[in-house]
Amino acid sequence: MQKKELDYLNVLKVIGQMPFNVGKKLLLDFLQGNSNNESIKRNLLDRKELFGYFSLYSRDEVEDLVENLLHNGLIDYVPLTENKFIKIITLTKKGKKELVDPSLHNKKLSSRFAIKETQITEQERMMFDSFDFFLKGYNDEQKKAITSSSSKMLCVAGAGSGKTTVLTKRIEFLTTFKSAAPEKILAITFTRKARAEMASRLSKSQYCTNVMTETFNSFCEKIIKKHNDLIYNKPTRVVSYGEKIKIFKIALKENNIDAGLAIESYFSFGQRREKTNEELATLLMNDCYSVIELYKINNKSLEELKEHANNNQLIEQKNIEMMYKLCYSIDSFMKRNGLRDYSDQIVHCIDFFKKNKNFIPQFDHMLVDEYQDVNSSQIELLDLINPANLFCVGDPRQSIFGWRGSKIKYVLNFEEKYPNCEIITLSTNYRSSKQIVNLINKSIEGLMLPDLKSFREENANLHLVNFESEEQEINFVISKILELRIPRNEIFVLARTNRIINDISQRMRLRGIKHLVKTEEKGREEEAAIDEVTLATVHSIKGLEADTVFVIGCTGINFPCRASDHPIIELVRIDDYDKEEEERRLFYVALSRAKKNLYMTYCGKNPTRFINQKMLETIGGKTSQPSIADYNAAAKLQSHSSDKLSMLKVWRKETAQRLNLPAYIIMHDRTLMEIIEMNPVDVEDLKNVRGIGPAKLERYGEEIINILNGGK
């Protein structure tokens, strides 16, 4: 093991051995050996064993090391009890355990995948020539993936490399030239949309009409429906979303849990900001079902959830205990009433196959898309089916769903699982311009995969733009959207968090910019209309592309993301992994959506450390500031409507101070935005605004109308 791989342990040792609590600056000065620091001199810290251990590191490198430990939960940055404005760095229980049993360096190493570029033999080229009528238009790597006779194959397909086309073309090759029976071929995708797209492509070939195209869940659901009487002792069906809501309410009542108090305990003040109680209750409910699913797909009992309570702070213990009660009630209700969730489909199908191996369908060929996203239950299902030939397509660079149970190790360890397998890389990117491909290569160098090559030689517009405030940043993006003379559905605005998405969505509505919001919570596979901008979290946009992409909020707070919209999911995660490396891959996914124009924007002093020096050189060597023209265009957005919104926010702030209440209790931002959009002329009109009930109407109605009419 190289020394550098374990250096993080010395940071943990320093924090644990300090004679008193230290802040971030003092810690960094100690690690770098800054003897001019007054506190170091006064307390003789320069006599400590590890003083200056990182003196050969740059300040940025040491900061990155500390931030990585923070992001992986090994240290915490907490305010002093007696003075909340002073923060200190402390070891967490997880950090103390890491000192005794180091594992983080193994996680770092396990996210690397050292493979070479695919080699094409002369014999293979001759074969490609003989099938030119069928393979015309494909590159040599694609041709090899389509025609290879290996029984176990992994196709490492980079962003924009045409993986879906290759997968469907391989099926066509097998049925047309290899006498493969279509009904003995199963193609597995991850989404209904991908399944429909694949089925549509295959339907165009007369030899592929009987090929099974399924998602993991749809395949298992068909098995369950076919053998329901053997699996269950009563009729069962998949629970609807409406039923989930009812069951959640029953669980609250059954455990005497007040929804309002549960929300206040479960979510932080920042997480509650700008959300209604109804929205927060929905998030809590979704987390309950996610925890149940996480435990089921990992073959764990909910009883193990209790163990997590003992390993956390008091407030977290209470939340985990509450989560256990709700999850237990929900799961019990569903079992009693013959209701199944998506995780049950796979788990129950696996159990059935284990007990009834003669009912496992036999396939000559099985093809799996998005293999980097598989979880342990899906792998177990593949092992049980055990097809004669297995072809998997995946990209370790785009493994971003570890937080919901996916495991990158399955794609990284494919060769270990199948020693005689063939690994083929698709390294030509057909989506993005050359400069964008160069940029994304440099963003993910640590994964040790071959660089992607760009098929498109034209230059791209790459911009890293800094702003003084988030408001300026959003106004800049909107002004650019209004300038662009391309179909609006060729524009993506991507952000790391739902909060940023909601903020910019409100501004877009105010400007009359039609847009489609995509988030993980929405779970819908909609596509924007030709006159709609796509506004999305990065997790929800994977697999899609656009001419122009804005990645906003490129700061160290968002990439890697310090906050979580799902606090308990983070606490009770069954399998740990390197969160920072997944965040780095997430940033890669965001950048790789762009075809021609890429804007990375941020406010504050520095951009995310994921933008390294090599990336800066590709961009042009520096961060740019908005031009005078950009400032003027953004300034125009401060229209009459914006003035009214500002006046309403001032009124809300003053009212909140007068009544000693949080501003969001007076009125949510979205309610203020809707007031501006509806432009009510009297109090009666305010009745149609969501978020203004009878009490608020009576208390604030006249004041609001007065502000809108120019008074105060």
Segment roles from a protein language model:
Residues R192, L482, I486-E582, L586:
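Core RecA-like ATPase module of SF1/SF2 helicases and allied nucleic-acid translocases
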